[in-house]
From Swiss-Prot:
This is Cardiolipin synthase A. It comes from Pectobacterium carotovorum subsp. carotovorum (strain PC1). Keywords: Cell inner membrane, Cell membrane, Lipid biosynthesis, Lipid metabolism, Membrane, Phospholipid biosynthesis, Phospholipid metabolism, Repeat, Transferase, Transmembrane, Transmembrane helix. PROSITE patterns: PLD. Residues 219-246, 399-426 form the PLD phosphodiesterase domain. It is an enzyme of class 2 (transferase). It is a multi-pass membrane protein. One of its GO terms (cellular component) is plasma membrane.
């Protein structure tokens, strides 16, 4: 009997090390950044069983078999739709400013569609203003309303949006809502989905979360886009979730969330529409294709119109697209670069680009929250401050709430606004959306918003930062090492 137990023990030991060796080999064979690979290996060898389960659940980017099959089926029809869209040559910009030309060229070559001109664009800096405009647009909607959000939390003015959507559906407007399962977990636990469905609204839970699915698909892959489409000609996007900041996470100790949204009228709504349709088909298997731009209602030739390029990122979209776009934007800066983000955990390449911009004389400012709702990300962000300050980057810590706006302004001309945080999750993983605007007028509007953020922030003093307690440096470096996994 003792021999039997000895054999079993050796088999278990052999299987244990074989499993670790197999996962190690899998990590090494995957084409990934060295810091990410090293961080995963450290976790696996310090906490083997936990590390292996974590890696198999979160370490590799895969949609799952069903979504992958749907994605492969929808691309031919999507590609055909894009080819037909390109026949509307008058909607595409043929010239860009010097600072924006490299980025627009990159986007056109990688995504197959260039920047679209003739759009009217309005910045919304408060939740109340955004909801007021949205309620008016929903009331006037005649054909369709589509929405996708990471978080939808009932309460406050959000109830008015729900009521307005129900009224629109009852008068014959096709309404579809796509919400991330993890972000909108409270919404799906309440009666609101059934109330909307009874009224005729299609409500879909995207990327459902449960333990069984952890072995079929990466569970921290999230639908992080925020898009509203109305009658295929009006669109909203930006950093705002469908939550009233007066009631959202008020026990987190970070204050109200501060967001930025853009309201767009024009042909670029069609580009946002095809992205929404792809997301919808990937989740439901139902095909939707937006109609082409209506030349009778969209003023393509207006001199005041904005040229906008849409960047969609996530599984199934051009790899590293948003990361390349950010790098191109930073390297294009000649005079000034202003970035706002709630979560700052950049890649080594992006960190190097930002520092290099400051070192070659560009006035670089980064605005981040003073208090963060994510303790892990907050500590990891601080680990980058020393290198940034040494390069001459100005770091502003926003003190009037949790600054959730994601924006980049280059030389007052090139603007990027959307859902992308400057962290690994947004850069490499989640479904995200970004608007690229080549326009000095819009750049001036965005600069005013960013200057207001700076006025409500504290400039980080390099000398005081160097004198912070030693224990804080240790914690920062610890989280810095694991930053590729955050």
């Amino acid at each position: 009997m003792s021999t039997f137990y000895t054999v079993i023990s050796w088999l278990l030991v052999f299987g244990y090390w074989l499993l670790i060796a197999g996962v190690t080999l899998r990590i090494l064979m995957k084409r990934r950044a060295v810091p990410s690979a090293m961080a995963w290996l450290l976790v696996i060898y310090i906490l083997p069983l936990v590390g292996i389960v974590a890696y198999l659940s979160f370490g590799e980017l895969h949609l799952g078999k069903r979504r992958a099959e749907r994605a492969s089926k929808m691309w031919p029809s999507t590609a055909k739709w894009l080819r037909e869209l390109k026949e509307y040559r008058r909607i595409f910009a043929t010239e860009n400013s010097e600072v924006a030309s490299a980025l627009f060229q990159l986007c056109e070559r990688r995504q197959g569609v260039g920047g679209v001109k003739g759009n009217q664009l309005q910045l919304m800096t408060t939740f109340d203003d955004t909801i007021k405009a949205l309620l008016r647009d929903i009331e006037l909607a005649r054909s369709n309303i589509e929405m996708v959000f990471y978080i939808w939390q009932p309460g406050g003015l959000v109830e008015q949006v729900s009521s307005s959507l129900i009224a629109a559906a009852r008068r014959g407007v096709h309404c579809r809502i796509l919400l991330d399962s993890a972000g909108s977990v409270q919404f799906f636990r309440q009666h609101h989905p059934e109330l909307m469905r009874t009224a005729g609204i299609e409500v879909v839970e995207a990327l459902k979360v449960n333990l069984f699915r952890a072995f079929l698909r990466r569970m921290d892959l999230r639908q992080h886009r925020k898009i509203i489409l109305i009658d295929n000609r009006i669109a909203y996007t930006g950093s705002m979730n469908m939550v009233d900041p007066r009631f959202f996470k008020q026990d987190a100790g970070v204050g109200q969330w501060i967001d930025l949204m853009a309201r767009i009228e024009g042909p670029v709504a069609t580009t946002l529409g095809i992205i929404y349709c792809c997301d919808w088909e990937m989740e439901t298997g139902k095909r939707l294709l937006p109609p082409p731009p209506d030349v009778n209602v969209m003023p393509f030739e207006q001199e005041s119109g904005h040229t906008i390029q849409v960047i969609a990122s996530g599984p199934g979209y051009p790899e590293e697209m948003i990361h390349q776009a950010l790098l191109t934007s930073v390297y294009s800066a000649r005079k000034q670069l202003i970035m706002t983000t709630p979560y700052f955990v950049p890649s080594d390449d992006l960190l190097h680009a930002i520092c290099t911009a400051a070192q070659r004389g560009v006035d670089v400012s980064i605005i981040v929250p003073h208090k963060n709702d994510s303790v892990l990300v907050g500590w990891a962000s601080r680990a980058f401050f020393t290198e940034l300050l040494a390069a001459g980057v100005k770091i502003y810590q926003f003190k009037d709430g949790l600054l959730h706006t994601k924006s980049v302004l280059v030389d007052g001309q090139l603007s990027l606004v959307g859902t992308v945080n400057l962290d690994m999750r947004s850069l490499w993983l989640n479904f995200e959306i970004t608007l690229v605007i080549d326009d000095a007028g819009f750049g001036s509007d965005l600069a005013c918003v960013q200057e207001d953020y700076i006025a409500r922030s504290r400039l980080l003093n390099a000398t005081q930062w160097q004198n912070r307690p030693y224990w804080q440096r240790i914690v920062e470096r610890l989280f810095y090492f694991f930053s590729p996994l955050l």
